[in-house]
UniProtKB/Swiss-Prot annotation:
PANTHER family: PROTEIN PREY, MITOCHONDRIAL, ZGC:162634. It comes from Chromohalobacter salexigens (strain ATCC BAA-138 / DSM 3043 / CIP 106854 / NCIMB 13768 / 1H11). One of its GO terms (cellular component) is cytosol. Coiled coil: none annotated. Pfam families: Trm112p. Belongs to the UPF0434 family. This is UPF0434 protein Csal_1588.
């Protein structure tokens, strides 16, 4: 993914910063809990195409990471 393109892209819902997830080929907005797919190196920035992240992923926890005592 081109770093210059990444620097220009924002979440279409909140205009917040996006985090690039290379493993899943997605751009993630942790504020809104949306993950936008990247297809053939082109970000698909449509809310209808975005995946909704689960609560742990939205908080930035890795899959299988233990929850703290307050969760």
């Amino acid at each position: 993914m081109d770093k210059e393109l990444l620097a220009m892209l924002v979440c279409p819902r909140c205009q917040g910063k996006l985090k690039y997830d290379r493993e899943r080929a997605e751009l993630k907005c942790h504020f809104d809990g949306l993950a936008f797919p990247i297809e053939d190196e082109i970000p698909v920035m449509l809310e209808e195409q975005a995946r909704h992240m689960d609560a742990d992923e939205k908080l930035g926890k890795a899959p299988g990471e233990a929850r703290d005592a307050t969760s």
